[in-house]
Amino acid sequence: MKKIEAIIKPFKLDEVKEALQEVGLQGITVTEAKGFGRQKGHAELYRGAEYIVDFLPKVKIEIVIGDDLVERAIDAIRRAAQTGRIGDGKIFVSNIEEAIRIRTGESGLDAI
């Protein structure tokens, strides 16, 4: 099993969700996040004064899937989230040793 974490632009969330559903994923966890990378922050005007906004709004998507779906899920996220502009985001993949469904006690792939 693998855990895929994707940091994307908030307005791309619906497209990414639909792309993952087409791959066959049944559930995702979404968290609002703020951060910056190479794009750094940007300047905004507020009441006539310019402020530097260091952290930009992002969305973090987390999914845990079987190894057989990893490449398809990564490709779906990448295609749906890509705008071609700086700040499109990142995808991280890590190993998951175990998953347990609290309600039933199922474990492994049966739990996801």
Swiss-Prot record:
Q: What is this protein called?
A: Nitrogen regulatory protein P-II
One annotated GO molecular function is: enzyme regulator activity
| GO term, biological process aspect, one | nitrogen fixation
Q: Which InterPro entries match?
A: N-reg_PII, N-reg_PII-like_a/b, N-reg_PII/ATP_PRibTrfase_C, N-reg_PII_CS, N-reg_PII_urydylation_site
Q: Which residues carry this modification: O-UMP-tyrosine?
A: 51
* PROSITE patterns (alphabetical): PII_GLNB_CTER, PII_GLNB_DOM, PII_GLNB_UMP
Q: Which UniProt keywords apply?
A: Nitrogen fixation, Nucleotide-binding, Phosphoprotein, Transcription, Transcription regulation
The protein's matches in PANTHER family, at most eight in alphabetical order, are given as: NITROGEN REGULATORY PROTEIN P-II, NITROGEN REGULATORY PROTEIN P-II HOMOLOG
Q: What is its quaternary makeup?
A: Homotrimer.
User: What is known about what this protein does?
Assistant: In nitrogen-limiting conditions, when the ratio of Gln to 2-ketoglutarate decreases, P-II is uridylylated to P-II-UMP. P-II-UMP allows the deadenylation of glutamine synthetase (GS), thus activating the enzyme. Conversely, in nitrogen excess P-II is deuridylated and promotes the adenylation of GS. P-II indirectly controls the transcription of the GS gene (glnA). P-II prevents NR-II-catalyzed conversion of NR-I to NR-I-phosphate, the transcriptional activator of glnA. When P-II is uridylylated to P-II-UMP, these events are reversed.
Q: Of which family is this protein a member? A: Belongs to the P(II) protein family.
Among the entry's GO cellular component annotations, what is one?
cytosol
